[in-house]
């Protein structure tokens, strides 16, 4: 069950583009009344031309979540926005705790009510033929004061997103660049760093490389890979994702489809 769980988290990522329609992860908000989603993407909706909200329906019952973005201003060719998210992971964590199939946390552990808060500043501008976005954020994990350090899930992508509940707070820094290649094809690369000051597992880095084929202003297909590095309780470790799975040929990439209407 571990690797399917990772794949879901991998694909639950943010892929940026150079228009307000494909604006997830940038400082741009969706136009008013616009919807956007994907196979493994949250559903986003434009409240007005400078505000949107996002909810991941796949996790809505087990991991209630909501993200709000506000585009504030333009300054020196940069578009500036703030993004604020709230997460309640306790139902999901308790559902994978215990003995038996689909359980990945030992049954002696129990997770209390945990609330995650994210607050980020996003800055986006055009550079050369592409678009660059920088981001910096504060992560807060509430309710984790009594968590047993042995209850961590020490696997890529999952651990750095849960570490904030064990450490209480953290920082997230990153940047993304997307640019046209030829015709309908464009390329995307990003880098994200998670820092948890005071923790023995304090540093995590993730980068994603994607090829994007845009069918129209309503549909696009993305394929690529993600690379991770982290300081886990068991030691430093790097990983290419997705990994080789018994049901897939070696080297199979991440695949996602986005639609908007």
Residue ranges: model-predicted function:
Residues 15-36, 246-252, 258:
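Outer-membrane beta-barrel biogenesis signature
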Residues 24-29, 33-43, 47-61, 66-68, ...:
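Transmembrane beta-strand segments that form the barrel wall of outer-membrane beta-barrel proteins
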Residues 35-39, 60-64, 78, 111-119, ...:
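Residues that define the transmembrane beta-barrel architecture of outer-membrane proteins
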Residues 41-45, 66-70, 117-125, 138-140, ...:
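Residues on the lipid-exposed face of transmembrane beta-strands in outer-membrane beta-barrel proteins
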Residues 48-50, 73-75, 127-130, 178-184, ...:
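Outer-membrane beta-barrel channels and translocator barrels
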Residues 68-69, 93-101, 145-153, 199-206, ...:
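Outer-membrane beta-barrel translocator domains and adjoining extracellular loop/strand segments
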Residues 112-197:
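Detector for outer-membrane/organellar transmembrane beta-barrel domains
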Residues 198-261:
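Predominantly the C-terminal beta-signal and adjacent terminal strand-loop region
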């Amino acid at each position: 069950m571990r690797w399917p769980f990772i794949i879901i988290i991998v694909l639950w990522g943010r892929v940026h583009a150079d228009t307000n329609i494909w604006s997830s992860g940038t400082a741009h908000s969706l136009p008013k009344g616009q919807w956007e989603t994907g196979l493994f993407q949250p559903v986003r909706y434009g409240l007005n031309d400078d505000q949107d909200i996002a909810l991941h329906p796949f996790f809505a019952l087990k991991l209630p979540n909501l993200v709000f973005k506000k585009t504030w201003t333009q300054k020196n060719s940069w578009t500036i926005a703030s993004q604020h998210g709230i997460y309640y992971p306790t139902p999901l964590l308790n559902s994978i705790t215990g003995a038996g199939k689909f359980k990945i946390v030992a049954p002696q552990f129990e997770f209390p009510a945990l609330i995650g808060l994210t607050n980020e500043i996003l800055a986006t501008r055009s550079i050369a033929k592409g678009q660059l976005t920088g981001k910096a954020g504060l992560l807060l994990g509430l309710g984790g004061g009594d968590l047993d350090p042995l209850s961590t899930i020490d696997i890529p992508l999952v651990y750095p997103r849960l570490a904030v509940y064990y450490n209480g707070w953290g920082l997230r820094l990153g940047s993304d660049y997307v640019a046209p290649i030829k015709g309908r094809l464009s390329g995307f690369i990003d880098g994200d760093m998670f820092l948890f000051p005071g923790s023995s597992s304090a540093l995590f880095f993730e980068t994603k490389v994607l090829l994007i084929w845009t069918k129209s202003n309503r549909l696009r297909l993305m394929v690529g890979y993600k690379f991770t590095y982290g300081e886990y309780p068991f030691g430093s470790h790097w990983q290419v994702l997705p990994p080789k799975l018994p049901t897939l040929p070696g080297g199979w990439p991440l695949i996602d489809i986005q639609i908007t209407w």
